[in-house]
Amino acid sequence: MPKQVKGLLGEKLGMTQVFDESGRVIPVTVVRAGPCVVTQVRTPDRDGYSAVQLGYGAVDPRRVNKPLAGHFRAAGVTPRRYLAEVRTGDAAEYTVGQEVTVEIFTPGQRVDVAGVSKGKGFAGLMKRHNFRGLPDSHGTERKHRSPGSIGACATPGRVFKGLRMAGRMGGRRVTVQNLAVQAVKPEENLLLLQGAVPGPNGGLVYVRTAAKGKANRDGGAA
């Protein structure tokens, strides 16, 4: 049976904490997820695979290019700022124009969250790769945060590919797996997810059913 995957686009609002039944403090990230609208349904017969395309976020129609404007017009929905595709085996159960809300998730369920990590700009080795650096004394002069040797002269006579060096840090798509859904608040379109998710407050995130199927806290499979 094809795997059924649920997914939503949303916005990271920030972090807070909640208390469980035993009074234990649990750090959670608050995500405003959806509502999303189905803008296209892909089928194996027509497209070669089964998926649902979701639209999220308001956008000025004047800022939508003509191909996308025609796409939204054909679907009969107002233009959306973001589009994402969810590959799922039950795509045929969706209809174009249908609204998808946070109610597709349940407390205790495990989800994966993808987003773009905070950009740190050009960073050195100690910040980017957690290098120790050179000694603070014993003759070290203006080289305390340098990498040290990156290769010998004649052998190998070059710098190996993939060597950890300074460079741009952050600003990349990151997926955090198997976060537990602590609470679902449909009236506010909010998800409370245990732990941290990538990106800054206000950043776009994609929440979907956990790919690795870790067991729920109540014993069922995610």
Swiss-Prot record:
GO terms for molecular function: rRNA binding; structural constituent of ribosome. The keyword Kinase does not apply. The keyword Lipid metabolism does not apply. Gene3D superfamilies: 3.30.160.810, Translation factors. InterPro entries: Ribosomal_uL3, Ribosomal_uL3_bac/org-type, Ribosomal_uL3_CS, Transl_B-barrel_sf. Residues 129-150 are annotated as: Disordered. Keywords: Ribonucleoprotein, Ribosomal protein, RNA-binding, rRNA-binding. GO terms for biological process: translation. PROSITE patterns: RIBOSOMAL_L3. GO terms for cellular component: cytosolic large ribosomal subunit. One of the primary rRNA binding proteins, it binds directly near the 3'-end of the 23S rRNA, where it nucleates assembly of the 50S subunit. Part of the 50S ribosomal subunit. Forms a cluster with proteins L14 and L19. Belongs to the universal ribosomal protein uL3 family. This is Large ribosomal subunit protein uL3.
